[in-house]
Amino acid sequence: MTKSKKQKQKKKDFLKKKLKVGKPTGKPSNSTDTSFTARTLSVRSQLVNNAGDDLRKRLPLLKHHNDKVRKETLGIYIKAIPKIISTQLMTPLISQTSQLICDDSKDVREQLLELFDEVGKHDEQVLKLHCRSLVLYINMGMTHILPRVQADSTKFLGCLLKYCGQEFCDQAWNKLMAGIFRVLSWETQHSKNSNQAAGAMQTSKRDNKFQAAHLSTLYALLECGCKEPTVETTDEDTTSNIQNFEEVQYMTPSFPQAYGYLKLFDKQLKSSSSNKDNSSVSSSDALDVESRIRNVENVYLPTMKKQIEQIIQEGGEAGKNANNIKKLISEIFS
């Protein structure tokens, strides 16, 4: 092909075609014929069956740097809970959302509280299976450096006590009681450090508006841990329970981690002498109601009575909750 022919072909690309009236325009060279018809059209990336995969792909967004993205992602999971409550997606969902208990954003924490409540309404066993990690992050929230995170930690505890309160009391009774006392800025029999007392006085003035919520959570924890659960049984049930007592011992337990108190697979760290004074009762010694009542009487009851009387005199919503705790204490220790 000569040089002149190449130049002519290049010029054709830049020439403007003249349009004539009544004559159609010419089709371009790269046009596609769309005159065919099809009965079905399948697009693999838009199948309805891939809804679960889409939710699984959204899990990394729970760690996004933008708090609005985290909140919107939690809202999507709240709407999808009825569909995914019995799927394998719940395990990674609870394990990743439990970390947001210590999130800096208030909107994210409120949305997370709604998510836990929605999960508990549909299937409380899901929360019971993850109660160990939930207790861990609630305890981290109670000792958080940010006051707003510390104040909201009791809201999560109060919500989860409705669905897995017995498991919480069995596994971390002393930690939860000490955490609520720390949030309320109350001293126990074992906290005699003057620096802690000075810090408690400063935080008590700052957190007065959250005091009513903390006291209601304390009431729920005491009621769940120090009162025997009331179960209505008939005479036929009692006789059948006595006959099948030996069989029940060898059957699958009705609650998760039935032998967790034995700590067969847990690695325990050696505690120093200073830490021993702060925890008079270990978690394995607070598995029944009697030991928890004994723990409250020896460690928390004197301070509780003293502080409650002062709050009742101040009145308000906190005074009402303190009065309820006073009635509960008199009922337990009567």
Curated annotation (Swiss-Prot):
Gene3D superfamilies registered for this protein in UniProt: Leucine-rich Repeat Variant
Record GO terms (molecular function): chromatin binding
GO biological process: maturation of LSU-rRNA from tricistronic rRNA transcript (SSU-rRNA, 5.8S rRNA, LSU-rRNA); pre-replicative complex assembly involved in nuclear cell cycle DNA replication; regulation of DNA-templated DNA replication initiation; ribosomal large subunit assembly
Keywords from the named record: Nucleus, Ribosome biogenesis, rRNA processing
A Pfam family reported for this protein in Swiss-Prot or TrEMBL: Ipi1_N
Disordered: annotated segments: 1-35
Primary location class: nucleus
Biased amino acid composition, Basic residues: 1-21
Localization of this protein: Nucleus
GO cellular component terms, A-Z: cytosol; nucleoplasm; rixosome complex
Subunit structure: Component of the RIX1 complex, composed of IPI1, RIX1/IPI2 and IPI3 in a 1:2:2 stoichiometry. The complex interacts (via RIX1) with MDN1 (via its hexameric AAA ATPase ring) and the pre-60S ribosome particles.
Role summary: Component of the RIX1 complex required for processing of ITS2 sequences from 35S pre-rRNA.
Family that this chain belongs to: Belongs to the IPI1/TEX10 family.
The protein, known as: Pre-rRNA-processing protein IPI1
Species of provenance: Candida glabrata (strain ATCC 2001 / BCRC 20586 / JCM 3761 / NBRC 0622 / NRRL Y-65 / CBS 138) (Yeast)
